[in-house]
């Protein structure tokens, strides 16, 4: 036993009071002088007598019963259904802990009692029976005091428990908020890292694209170099290339005659070169492929010649018809002059006769010369005619043509005139080839108004000797009008 228990027992001995139990509801019976024993209440689980042995060895009986706990339901602190209840807060403390702390809750009160006051004390009957309390000195706790003390204690305990709960919840809430803030910061850092990674990947992709374009350019240049080494014709200029069968079969005379018309072969050869380069770029070039291609080109020369000869001949014939109609429409002063047809129509008749002679000689020339040569000549003649007739006529050589047309029709026949013109062209061909002039080539000139007036002036100067002055006057009147 400790000192506290010894102190309580000594006080109990002095006061003859048992304070071992405490209940919020106390059943009191009228105090009797006779100290008879407490009657049995075995149904409630209480012992009849509780004897204590003092230090002297004498036994004395306690006036209050000491409960013995049989089970949780028979505990004396268990609330009875018909007893008054004191509102208390149910704490989370277990029952054994409450039983161990019951001694600290004892608040003994010493109240002196007298016989008069004992008679005035109300008799409070317990639901199970009345118990006898001695008169000498007893601890009387009224129900109001017990209830007040019982209410005071739970209130204090509840306030303490609430404060303890608040103290415990605040740190937990603080921990939760800090954890949330920490998780928020980590998420923000993760997002920043992801954004930085995305930017790095974008920069890397741009760098890789630039490398890809640079390598593709280098590969293209290497392909061109390899194709140039394997195919020497690509290194030569366009004029000297021999892989074009059409350009190879064109005679040298036609090439020199049309030196000024270099735009057409260049424009024709550019698509071929582009197509050839595209084929070289699209697939790897090998010497076997080049040889096979050349063999196919050589074998297809005859088919190409027959393919292009008929359309070009038809096109040349159509061009002659158009030129004849234009010359006839430009000869507008035939109806106004009223002179004989022989004198007025000498220039046009010469051109018509030359056209007929060319038509008559063209089939023979085509039969004599190779088919490819005729096709090339007709093509270059058509180009020259278009250039001379539609783009303008070079008038610096008009005097030579006028003298030829002025002298030949009067004194020579048409056949001799054509022979003289052909000899004149042959003598001047070398000069035309060197200078690139198209005036002395085999090209037909359109009869414009100015040239026709000059021809008429020349014819009038010849016919004035025979006394024909009226024609010159009429022509001047027509021109002035």
Swiss-Prot record:
This is Topoisomerase I damage affected protein 11. Residues 257-287, 332-359, 368-377 have a biased composition (Polar residues). Residues 30-62, 252-306, 332-377, 400-481 are annotated as: Disordered. InterPro entries: Tda11. Pfam families: TDA11. It comes from Saccharomyces cerevisiae (strain AWRI1631) (Baker's yeast). Its main location: cytoplasm. Residues 179-231 form a coiled coil. Keywords: Coiled coil, Cytoplasm, Phosphoprotein. It is found in: Cytoplasm. Belongs to the TDA11 family.
């Amino acid at each position: 036993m400790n000192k506290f228990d010894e102190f309580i027992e000594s006080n109990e001995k002095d006061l003859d009071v048992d304070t071992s139990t405490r209940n919020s509801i106390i059943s009191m019976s009228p105090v009797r002088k006779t100290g008879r024993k407490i009657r049995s209440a075995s149904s409630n689980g209480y012992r009849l007598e509780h004897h204590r042995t003092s230090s002297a060895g004498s036994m004395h009986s306690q006036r209050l019963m000491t409960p013995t706990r049989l089970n949780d339901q028979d505990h004396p602190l268990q609330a009875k259904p018909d007893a008054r209840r004191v509102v208390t807060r149910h704490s989370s403390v277990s029952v054994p802990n409450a039983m161990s702390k019951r001694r600290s809750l004892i608040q003994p009160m010493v109240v002196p009692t007298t016989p008069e006051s004992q008679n005035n004390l109300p008799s409070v009957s317990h639901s199970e029976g009345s118990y006898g309390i001695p008169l000498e000195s007893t601890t009387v706790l009224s129900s109001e005091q017990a209830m007040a003390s019982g209410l005071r204690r739970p209130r204090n305990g509840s306030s303490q428990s609430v404060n303890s709960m608040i103290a415990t919840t605040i740190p937990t809430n603080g921990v939760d908020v800090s954890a949330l803030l920490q998780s928020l910061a980590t998420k923000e850092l993760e997002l920043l890292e992801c954004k930085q990674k995305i930017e790095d990947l974008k920069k890397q992709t741009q760098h890789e694209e630039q490398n890809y374009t640079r390598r593709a350019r280098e590969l293209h240049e290497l392909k061109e170099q390899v194709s140039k080494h394997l195919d020497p014709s690509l290194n030569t200029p366009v004029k000297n290339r021999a892989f074009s069968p059409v350009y190879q079969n064109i005679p040298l005379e036609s090439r020199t005659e049309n030196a000024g018309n270099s735009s057409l072969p260049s424009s024709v050869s550019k698509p071929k070169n582009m197509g050839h380069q595209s084929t070289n770029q699209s697939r790897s070039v090998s010497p076997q492929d080049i040889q096979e291609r050349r063999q196919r080109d050589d074998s297809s020369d005859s088919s190409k010649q027959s393919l292009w000869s008929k359309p070009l001949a038809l096109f040349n014939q159509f061009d002659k018809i158009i030129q004849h109609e234009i010359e006839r429409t430009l000869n507008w002063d035939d109806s106004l002059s009223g002179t004989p047809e022989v004198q007025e129509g000498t220039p046009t008749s010469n051109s018509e006769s030359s056209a007929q002679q060319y038509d008559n000689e063209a089939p023979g020339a085509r039969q004599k010369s190779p088919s490819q040569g005729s096709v090339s000549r007709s093509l270059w003649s058509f180009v020259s005619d278009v250039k001379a007739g539609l783009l303008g006529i070079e008038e610096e050589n008009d005097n030579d043509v006028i003298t030829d047309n002025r002298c030949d029709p009067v004194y020579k026949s048409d056949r001799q005139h054509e022979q003289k013109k052909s000899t004149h062209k042959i003598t001047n061909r070398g000069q035309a080839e060197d200078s690139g002039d198209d005036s002395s080539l085999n090209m037909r000139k359109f009869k414009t108004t100015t040239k026709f007036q000059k021809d008429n002036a020349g014819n009038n100067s010849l016919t004035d000797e025979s006394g024909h002055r009226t024609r010159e006057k009429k022509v001047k009147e027509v021109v002035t009008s």
